[in-house]
Amino acid sequence: MLIPSKLSRPVRLDHTVVRERLLAKLSGANNFRLALITSPAGYGKTTLISQWAAGKNDIGWYSLDEGDNQQERFASYLIAAVQQATNGHCAICETMAQKRQYASLTSLFAQLFIELAEWHSPLYLVIDDYHLITNPVIHESMRFFIRHQPENLTLVVLSRNLPQLGIANLRVRDQLLEIGSQQLAFTHQEAKQFFDCRLSSPIEAAESSRICDDVSGWATALQLIALSARQNTHSAHKSARRLAGINASHLSDYLVDEVLDNVDLATRHFLLKSAILRSMNDALITRVTGEENGQMRLEEIERQGLFLQRMDDTGEWFCYHPLFGNFLRQRCQWELAAELPEIHRAAAESWMAQGFPSEAIHHALAAGDALMLRDILLNHAWSLFNHSELSLLEESLKALPWDSLLENPQLVLLQAWLMQSQHRYGEVNTLLARAEHEIKDIREDTMHAEFNALRAQVAINDGNPDEAERLAKLALEELPPGWFYSRIVATSVLGEVLHCKGELTRSLALMQQTEQMARQHDVWHYALWSLIQQSEILFAQGFLQTAWETQEKAFQLINEQHLEQLPMHEFLVRIRAQLLWAWARLDEAEASARSGIEVLSSYQPQQQLQCLAMLIQCSLARGDLDNARSQLNRLENLLGNGKYHSDWISNANKVRVIYWQMTGDKAAAANWLRHTAKPEFANNHFLQGQWRNIARAQILLGEFEPAEIVLEELNENARSLRLMSDLNRNLLLLNQLYWQAGRKSDAQRVLLDALKLANRTGFISHFVIEGEAMAQQLRQLIQLNTLPELEQHRAQRILREINQHHRHKFAHFDENFVERLLNHPEVPELIRTSPLTQREWQVLGLIYSGYSNEQIAGELEVAATTIKTHIRNLYQKLGVAHRQDAVQHAQQLLKMMGYGV
């Protein structure tokens, strides 16, 4: 819940001097990306901008405090301020900020700018007290904001120092409007206006000018002088002389003498007690100070000029001038030290009553009241956890004694989930083990089941499926039906375990159950996870179309619940890329992989390994080895600088081994084969993939016998576990083994099986990457004209893809080849006496490669009628009548020249 006062522009007060010269400068603010107002405390920055903002509608205001260094809190308030300025135009961003469903501030801002592209009016966003921001991530994100904000948006930043926002660059590009302390300092005329408004007896212009010069036009000093003069403690000029040369850090003594010592004791205590509140309203004041009418007291303090300012148009929320507020808080610690814990407790209770638990926690921590802090956490911690208030929760839990956590195991569980969310898996188990050892009777308690559900999640994340299965089953046996979150976790883990063990049908059923429960209870990240797992399972079973449809449901969920920036989104677009690649939709597959990298742009580069491997797969399928090599350099660098799950390594190794196969790099393959992991089992698609990598490397090295043993065992496992996509891949690799070993009939047999199975999987690119060896076999099958219709169609499609992406494969009939052919002693006499033109040789090569007349015309960029003429001349010179005869003739020529066909 957001505090309204932080989003309210300060009310323009009566008796303030209208800064006409500065307002004139600000009137052109819409021509700049950034308007920067900087000065030490008390120069009137906020007052000036509130005057400028008066009457403007398209403006959002965000007043910062120290707590806004939390990225999630900063994001929530900033987006809320934009919503205020646009009347709720950016609904998607608002939902993402509220639910913390974004990968980083920069990615959230990128989405914001997409939505603002439809907002065409001038727009202003004011951020007050930016000097309070010390978080470098927020600074970097705001630099991104300024670089990419729409042209019609102006950011207005108020700060006591020069913020780290790339100011120099903006200044050089004339995109910065600056107002500093010298311009903010009051002129003689403004000082005279100020005193005329504040003092019952006007002072002479010359006297006013001298006072203004004595304090260098510092607005706070002028206000203190006016206050002192009204209280008749000193003359205005005497006060001015005392303040001359003083800066904000040396005001304490003066404020004690001239303000606190000149109010009655009740007012003094009111000021000191109320100052602990960063913002205040009637209810807070009544509870903290004991005053019966808080609103009336606040208005009275405001009338006395005691540096209190309204924060909203309704006059409900107030705050002290930052300079005076800091002074009062320091004095409160000295003068009311004994009462201070009770004052903070009162503030916490009042904030809780108004529904602001995070503010209440701030005061409970300040009070050092562990019992109050415990009670707040017991009632609100899980809500704060689900809203990603992780740093606040961590600080709170650290403040509680261990005994308090033991008495409330829910808080131990919360602390463990915090660790799990930060991938501190070892610490999770240590914490839970210690708690279970010390909590009496917990093993008979439902809490023990919740512990086990979390432990199961940690175990599966840490690559220990057997332990995860044991713990998940224990949790499900012990958890009551109503404990939905832990039941969702345990069910999901059990489904993932079964997936790892190759029990796909049971795994699919559990993941569907997880999805249903997660949707019912609005646990959207587990709903998304279950859909992703379902898609992977269906892909492994060979049901790629159903996997596609499941992915569509996942994309719909992401859009509806604004989950675009969860890291899980990358998983979804990556498996979509894998599916598109299988179907030879390479441009779409590449775009999907790149979008996955974009989702992870704010994470460590190592997280991008899988998407990078997918990009390399696209390059390999296109036969673009130069691009593949460039990307492989980066992939191998990432592999050497990170720790990865075994299936990540397997996917990365896959593209490396295929590249070595395509380039004939036997040395690299042999070196890799000596050091790579050889899993004990092959009962899921992750392990099947690694063993397939091993077999491919063995085939490249001519180690056909061990490769055949591996592939036959893989096929046996794949058939028994119904891993149909893996079976399809294995058959293709076995085909290459047989082909290279000269076992042509075996090669044809498994290729026919692979083509038949591809009717179910839809595989295209898995055939294409095998290159010319695959093309030669498919040409022969097509020429035999014995394939069933579906397989015939697929074979022709695969051949077209090979020809399109591996054009060097049909370059046998280039000029050098033809010259060598004509000089060969066994060349047919007909070719010697009626030589083909270079164009006719090109056409023969394309016919042999399986191109249709239309495709040949497109390849050579000539009319189809021209191609028909070339073919007629070609047939006449070769003495053939049909295309199949021409293909056989070309095949004989290639064999004569020593090419294996």
Curated annotation (Swiss-Prot):
Region (DT4): 807-901
Binding site for ATP: S39, P40, A41, G42, Y43, G44, K45, T46
GO MF entry, a single one: ATP binding
Induction field: Expression is induced by the cAMP-activated global transcriptional regulator CRP. Repressed by the Mlc transcriptional repressor.
Region (DT3): 437-806
DNA-binding residue intervals: 853-872
CDD domains associated with the record: LuxR_C_like
Domain of life (superkingdom): Bacteria
Record text on subunit structure and interactions: Monomer in solution. Oligomerizes to an active state in the presence of the positive effectors ATP and maltotriose. Interacts with MalY, MalK and Aes, all of which negatively regulate MalT activity by antagonizing maltotriose binding.
Family indicated by similarity: Belongs to the MalT family.
HAMAP family: HTH_type_MalT
Protein name: HTH-type transcriptional regulator MalT
